[in-house]
Amino acid sequence: MPKLDWIIEIIANGVACAKCGRVEDTFPECICNAHTHGMKKYHHPDFQLVLHISDEDIGYILNSLGLRVQAGEQFKAGDLVEGIFEDCPVRLDSFQETGREVLRVIIPDSQNRFPEDPNCEYPYSFQLVPTNMLKQSEGGVC
Protein backbone atom coordinates (compact mmCIF):
# COMPACT_ATOMS: atom_id res chain seq x y z
CA MET A 1 0.00 0.00 0.00
CA PRO A 2 1.34 3.47 -0.89
CA LYS A 3 2.51 5.67 1.95
CA LEU A 4 0.68 8.96 2.46
CA ASP A 5 3.68 11.24 2.91
CA TRP A 6 1.82 14.55 2.95
CA ILE A 7 -0.50 16.15 5.45
CA ILE A 8 -3.96 17.62 5.16
CA GLU A 9 -4.73 20.76 7.15
CA ILE A 10 -8.39 21.69 7.63
CA ILE A 11 -9.14 25.23 8.79
CA ALA A 12 -12.87 25.37 9.47
CA ASN A 13 -15.44 26.76 11.86
CA GLY A 14 -15.47 24.85 15.13
CA VAL A 15 -11.97 23.45 14.64
CA ALA A 16 -9.21 24.39 17.10
CA CYS A 17 -5.90 25.55 15.68
CA ALA A 18 -3.11 23.05 16.32
CA LYS A 19 -0.68 25.96 16.93
CA CYS A 20 -2.59 28.38 19.15
CA GLY A 21 -5.64 26.39 20.30
CA ARG A 22 -8.17 29.06 19.29
CA VAL A 23 -11.33 27.81 17.63
CA GLU A 24 -12.04 29.11 14.12
CA ASP A 25 -15.38 30.90 13.62
CA THR A 26 -14.94 33.30 10.69
CA PHE A 27 -15.91 31.26 7.61
CA PRO A 28 -19.34 31.40 5.96
CA GLU A 29 -21.45 28.30 6.51
CA CYS A 30 -20.23 25.31 4.44
CA ILE A 31 -16.87 26.96 3.60
CA CYS A 32 -13.39 26.04 4.88
CA ASN A 33 -9.75 26.04 3.79
CA ALA A 34 -8.60 22.42 3.53
CA HIS A 35 -5.27 21.88 1.82
CA THR A 36 -2.32 19.56 1.52
CA HIS A 37 1.30 20.12 2.46
CA GLY A 38 3.87 17.84 0.88
CA MET A 39 3.29 17.66 -2.87
CA LYS A 40 6.44 19.74 -3.42
CA LYS A 41 8.57 16.59 -3.10
CA TYR A 42 6.81 15.39 -6.27
CA HIS A 43 7.47 18.72 -8.03
CA HIS A 44 3.75 19.38 -7.93
CA PRO A 45 1.56 22.09 -6.38
CA ASP A 46 -0.43 21.23 -3.27
CA PHE A 47 -4.20 20.85 -3.45
CA GLN A 48 -6.93 22.91 -1.79
CA LEU A 49 -10.65 22.34 -1.19
CA VAL A 50 -12.93 25.09 0.16
CA LEU A 51 -16.26 23.27 0.49
CA HIS A 52 -16.70 22.21 4.11
CA ILE A 53 -17.91 18.69 3.48
CA SER A 54 -17.15 15.89 5.93
CA ASP A 55 -13.53 15.48 7.04
CA GLU A 56 -13.70 11.94 5.63
CA ASP A 57 -14.75 13.23 2.19
CA ILE A 58 -12.11 15.98 2.27
CA GLY A 59 -9.50 13.33 3.07
CA TYR A 60 -10.77 11.04 0.32
CA ILE A 61 -10.62 13.77 -2.35
CA LEU A 62 -7.25 15.27 -1.39
CA ASN A 63 -5.61 11.89 -0.74
CA SER A 64 -6.95 10.46 -4.02
CA LEU A 65 -5.31 13.31 -5.90
CA GLY A 66 -2.13 12.98 -3.82
CA LEU A 67 -1.89 9.26 -4.55
CA ARG A 68 -2.25 9.91 -8.26
CA VAL A 69 0.58 12.47 -8.09
CA GLN A 70 2.66 10.01 -6.08
CA ALA A 71 2.11 7.45 -8.88
CA GLY A 72 3.49 9.93 -11.41
CA GLU A 73 0.42 11.78 -12.69
CA GLN A 74 0.81 15.55 -13.06
CA PHE A 75 -2.09 17.99 -12.90
CA LYS A 76 -2.39 21.61 -13.96
CA ALA A 77 -4.91 24.41 -13.70
CA GLY A 78 -7.89 23.83 -15.97
CA ASP A 79 -7.71 20.03 -15.85
CA LEU A 80 -11.00 18.16 -15.56
CA VAL A 81 -10.20 15.15 -13.39
CA GLU A 82 -12.26 11.99 -13.71
CA GLY A 83 -12.38 9.22 -11.14
CA ILE A 84 -12.92 11.20 -7.94
CA PHE A 85 -16.72 11.01 -8.20
CA GLU A 86 -18.64 8.48 -10.29
CA ASP A 87 -21.04 10.97 -11.87
CA CYS A 88 -18.92 14.03 -12.64
CA PRO A 89 -15.37 15.31 -13.02
CA VAL A 90 -13.80 17.86 -10.71
CA ARG A 91 -11.85 20.81 -12.09
CA LEU A 92 -8.53 22.11 -10.83
CA ASP A 93 -8.01 25.89 -10.74
CA SER A 94 -4.93 27.82 -9.65
CA PHE A 95 -5.26 29.87 -6.43
CA GLN A 96 -2.97 31.42 -3.83
CA GLU A 97 -3.04 29.94 -0.33
CA THR A 98 -0.80 31.59 2.30
CA GLY A 99 1.63 32.82 -0.34
CA ARG A 100 1.90 29.66 -2.42
CA GLU A 101 0.17 28.46 -5.55
CA VAL A 102 -2.22 25.55 -5.04
CA LEU A 103 -4.60 23.66 -7.28
CA ARG A 104 -8.08 24.18 -5.88
CA VAL A 105 -10.48 21.29 -6.40
CA ILE A 106 -13.69 22.72 -7.85
CA ILE A 107 -16.68 20.42 -7.40
CA PRO A 108 -19.80 20.94 -9.53
CA ASP A 109 -23.18 21.30 -7.82
CA SER A 110 -25.97 18.69 -7.87
CA GLN A 111 -26.82 19.69 -11.46
CA ASN A 112 -23.13 19.40 -12.51
CA ARG A 113 -22.81 23.20 -12.81
CA PHE A 114 -19.50 24.85 -12.00
CA PRO A 115 -19.32 28.16 -10.04
CA GLU A 116 -19.06 30.44 -13.08
CA ASP A 117 -22.58 29.31 -14.09
CA PRO A 118 -25.01 31.92 -12.66
CA ASN A 119 -27.37 29.08 -11.67
CA CYS A 120 -24.73 27.23 -9.64
CA GLU A 121 -26.03 26.39 -6.16
CA TYR A 122 -24.54 27.67 -2.89
CA PRO A 123 -22.06 26.71 -1.48
CA TYR A 124 -20.64 25.40 -4.76
CA SER A 125 -20.95 28.90 -6.24
CA PHE A 126 -18.52 30.18 -3.58
CA GLN A 127 -15.56 28.08 -4.77
CA LEU A 128 -14.00 30.80 -6.95
CA VAL A 129 -13.57 33.26 -4.08
CA PRO A 130 -9.86 33.98 -3.45
CA THR A 131 -8.50 32.26 -0.35
CA ASN A 132 -7.81 35.53 1.48
CA MET A 133 -11.48 36.55 1.04
CA LEU A 134 -13.09 33.31 2.26
CA LYS A 135 -13.46 34.51 5.84
CA GLN A 136 -16.35 36.77 6.89
CA SER A 137 -14.20 38.72 9.34
CA GLU A 138 -10.54 39.39 10.08
CA GLY A 139 -10.53 37.22 13.20
CA GLY A 140 -9.82 33.56 13.31
CA VAL A 141 -6.82 31.54 14.29
CA CYS A 142 -3.12 32.25 13.82
Model-derived features: positions:
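Acidic, proline/glycine-rich low-complexity IDRs
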Residues: M1-I31, M39-C142
